């Protein structure tokens, strides 16, 4: 009986794996066929040319350092902006979600600033911080801040009332309810905000690195390679960006599935 169940599980996993890789594989085949048909690497390079860039990550490329060097620089910028956004957005979101007065005070300003795209802040960022790291980190901060904040507020406001009433019945007071009931119960929503914020932060760093203030990073390398008509390098950088974004998302989803399984059971 156990062997039969294992066999079914292996079949399901194999089918799921095939489904997951079939579309990317088809995209690669179409890409290669189009590249052969166009026969112009400036418009669309062959798959082999891009792979050749990817399999030499430690080699210097176009005089801008290696792929690894530029990737690490971009990751450091994302971490800085993302951690700063989390450090501000999570406490503020908890306060706005739990205290009506704080929400009334901050809500109008937040809703006014939230629709503004991160790249619209670029002129102000350059004016405030100059041509340096802080201008790029600020753009990343703006991109990650609002998804984390909104999900935190939503999570705190969405804590079931019976849960709070039960804590009150057991003698818990305002601060204890916030720390021991509200924050743990809203953690899944906060994590969702972190997942969305991380994705946007990663997109923002690439855009920020295309600005005049940058001389390294994947975004800078994309623009520099484009100026030299090296589309193989451009696509290689795009693939790295996509892979890192995928790893970030899957990592946070794994944490959500592993430690917040009770949330799915409640639904």
UniProtKB/Swiss-Prot annotation:
SUPFAM superfamilies referenced in this protein's UniProt entry, alphabetically: MetI-like
Pfam family, one: BPD_transp_1
GO biological process: transmembrane transport
Domain ABC transmembrane type-1 intervals: 71-252
Keyword terms: Cell membrane, Membrane, Transmembrane, Transmembrane helix, Transport
A single GO cellular-component term on record: plasma membrane
Membrane topology field: Multi-pass membrane protein
Compartments where found: Cell membrane
Highest taxon above the source species: Archaea
Residue stretches spanning the membrane: 18-38, 48-68, 78-98, 115-135, 136-156, 188-208, 228-248
InterPro entries given in the database record: MetI-like, MetI-like_sf
Family statement: Belongs to the binding-protein-dependent transport system permease family. CysTW subfamily.
Role, per record: Probably part of a binding-protein-dependent transport system. Probably responsible for the translocation of the substrate across the membrane.
Name of the protein in its database record: Putative ABC transporter permease protein MJ0413
Organism (species): Methanocaldococcus jannaschii (strain ATCC 43067 / DSM 2661 / JAL-1 / JCM 10045 / NBRC 100440) (Methanococcus jannaschii)
């Amino acid at each position: 009986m156990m062997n039969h169940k294992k066999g079914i599980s292996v079949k399901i996993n194999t089918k799921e794996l095939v489904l997951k890789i079939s579309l990317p594989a088809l995209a690669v085949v179409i890409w290669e066929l189009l590249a052969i048909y166009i026969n112009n690497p400036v418009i669309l390079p062959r798959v082999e040319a891009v792979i050749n860039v990817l399999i030499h990550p430690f080699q210097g490329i176009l005089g801008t350092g290696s792929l690894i060097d530029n990737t690490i620089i971009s990751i450091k910028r994302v971490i800085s902006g993302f951690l700063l956004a989390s450090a501000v957005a999570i406490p503020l979101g908890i306060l706005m979600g739990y205290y009506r007065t704080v929400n009334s005070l901050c809500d109008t300003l937040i809703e006014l600033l939230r629709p503004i795209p991160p790249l619209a802040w670029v002129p102000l960022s350059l004016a405030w911080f100059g041509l340096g790291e802080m201008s790029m980190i600020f753009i990343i901060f703006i991109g990650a801040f609002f998804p984390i904040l909104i999900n935190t507020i939503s999570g705190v406001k969405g804590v079931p009332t019976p849960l709070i009433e039960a804590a009150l019945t057991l003698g818990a007071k305002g601060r204890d309810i916030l720390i021991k009931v509200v924050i743990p119960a809203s953690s899944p929503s906060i994590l969702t905000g972190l997942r969305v914020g991380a994705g946007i932060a990663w997109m923002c760093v690439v855009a920020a690195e295309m600005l005049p203030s940058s001389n390294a990073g994947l975004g800078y390398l994309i623009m520099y390679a484009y100026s030299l008509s090296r589309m193989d390098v451009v696509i290689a950088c795009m693939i790295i960006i996509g892979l890192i974004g995928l790893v970030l998302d899957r990592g946070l989803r794994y944490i959500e599935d592993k430690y917040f399984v009770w949330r799915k059971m409640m639904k």
